[in-house]
Regions:
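Gly/Pro-enriched, hydrophobic low-complexity segments
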Residues: 23-24, 29-57, 86, 99, ...
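Solvent-exposed N-terminal domain segments of exported/luminal and surface proteins
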Residues: 26-259, 266
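Acidic/proline-rich low-complexity IDRs
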Residues: 6-7, 14-15, 31, 35, ...
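Gram-negative bacterial Sec-dependent N-terminal signal peptides
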Residues: 1-21
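Extended beta-strand-rich segments in extracellular/periplasmic secretory proteins, especially
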Residues: 187-225, 229-238, 295-372, 382
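Long, C-terminal catalytic modules of enzymes
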Residues: 432-459
Length: 459
């Protein structure tokens, strides 16, 4: 009897922890070297040529010496003109290319909101080791779950599911996408009053690191390390009443082994404390609580606990892309009264994966449903929309993509979030006196530990 119970228990555990989604066949994986790009997008352009063929890293004569030093980044397409503009008056003509959120913004601000659409450039690329690992991941990566948390095993330094079969796999591609290895930046995060006045939530020195993208890392070594992935550390210097605060967030690629860890340093308390609420629909204090923590940069939390994900397919959509122009602007030039300045945001036509996330029965969250629009080339969320529990569209996120030739690739560093019955906010504005986002050597596990917050902030 005891033996029977042990065998039954082992079977249940295996079903819960084991792979929920089978890896693709070798024949399918070989498409990454023919009809698909090395990261899983369609290599060919579309029928009318408005989306071009992917041809790898472009040679745009980037001033790499300045970019590596953190100087202001240049716009390779500064001389291009819009092909056309989408407004409230003509959006019906482009309805199938617009997200529900973008249509809602055009309808709410018919006199001022506009999409200027430019020629499409597919600039995303990555180092060869990322391509090689993505090819290997296609047949070795496994989605695992314990019935509550989930994760990925067998995937490192590349896209885990470059030929996705479902929404969960697209979600993990988003979480584990290529975006460099280690960076530092100086950023400002704003919310806006009803009259359009910016309110500084925080000005901070920030560090971000992606341990799963260490060159030469093996799946076995990554597992021994505890599946580390995204690491974030922030030190606030403005506004004055928040100066000295610190925040650290550590995410993994396998939440069945290690869930999100977060710590906060508060000057008034002069100590580091755990911050378990840094996630989900907790108001984000970095931007004065104007957005939720799981809305940052079009993100989803690594760990899947509250939502069911459904892959709705792939379609052509207008998304913010190649927005290097924003790097050279002042904040006054970027902001309008009720939304970003449409004169400075560049939109292009790209193919995106559409993923719908619906709140699980019995789970709590202020947002009942979301749709994510994930760029096929970068696996970044270009936009997402959120609906409240009455079925009304409520929240709209827009995340411009920038070309970073020194990484290389298209990365997201700031976003605009609109609450349709409230205020709007923006994160990751690289302000004038500081320096542009720049690559740095990886920090050690000790440096990305909670003691660093208190040591850095002793006054």
């Amino acid at each position: 009897m005891k033996t029977h119970i042990k065998l039954l228990s082992a079977t249940i555990v295996a079903l819960l922890i084991g792979s929920a989604h089978a890896a693709v066949t070798q024949e399918e994986a070989d498409q990454l070297k023919t009809t698909l790009t090395p990261l899983g997008a369609e290599r060919a352009g579309n029928k009318d040529g408005s989306i071009p063929e992917w041809k790898g890293c472009p040679d745009l004569k980037a001033p790499l010496d300045k970019l590596k030093a953190g100087d202001r980044r240049w716009d390779p397409y500064a001389n291009e003109k819009p092909l056309y503009s989408v407004t409230a008056a003509n959006m019906a003509q482009y309805e199938d290319k617009l997200s529900e959120g973008v249509k809602a913004l055009l309808a709410k601000y018919p006199q001022t909101m506009r999409l200027d659409v430019y020629p499409t450039h597919r600039n995303h690329c990555a180092p060869d080791y990322v391509y090689e690992n993505t090819y290997k991941n296609a047949t070795r990566a496994k989605y695992v779950t314990n019935g509550k948390e989930d994760g990925v095993e067998g995937a490192v330094a590349g896209i885990p599911f470059p030929i996705p079969k479902n929404g969960i796999e697209v979600r993990w591609n988003l979480n584990m996408r290529w975006r460099g290895v280690a960076f530092e930046s100086k950023d400002r995060h704003y919310s806006f009053t009803s009259s359009g006045q910016p309110v500084l939530g925080s000005q901070a020195h920030q560090f971000e690191q992606y341990d799963a993208y260490q060159e030469g890392l093996t799946p076995e070594e990554h597992a021994k390390q505890g599946y580390p992935n995204f690491k974030f550390m922030q030190f606030v210097d403005q506004p004055t009443f928040r100066a000295g605060e610190g925040l650290m967030v550590l995410d993994s690629t396998n939440c069945t082994v290690q869930d999100r860890q977060a710590w906060q340093y508060l000057v008034g308390q002069r100590r580091v404390r755990r911050a378990p609420t840094v996630g989900w629909d907790t108001p984000d204090f970095v931007v004065s609580g104007s957005n939720f923590f799981d809305e940052v940069f079009g993100s989803v939390l690594s760990c899947n606990e509250r939502y069911e994900y459904k892959l709705l397919g792939k379609k052509e959509m207008l998304i913010p892309y190649n927005n290097n122009k924003l790097f050279s602007l002042t904040e006054k030039e970027m902001f309008g009264q009720n939304h970003h300045n449409p004169d400075v945001l560049r939109w292009e036509l790209h193919r995106v994966w559409v993923v719908e996330a619906t709140l699980k029965d019995g789970k709590r969250h202020a947002v009942q449903k979301r749709k994510f629009y994930v760029d096929e080339d970068t696996w970044s969320t270009a936009m997402f929309d959120g609906w409240d529990h009455s079925g009304k569209i409520w929240r709209v996120s827009i995340s411009p993509a920038y070309y970073f030739p020194d990484v290389p690739g298209m990365l997201i560093h700031n976003d605009f979030l609109y609450v349709l019955d409230g205020a709007w906010s923006t994160r990751g504005v690289m302000y004038e006196p500081g320096f542009q986002m720049r690559q740095i050597p990886m920090k050690s596990k000790t440096e990305f530990g909670p003691d660093t917050l208190s040591a850095r902030n002793i006054r």
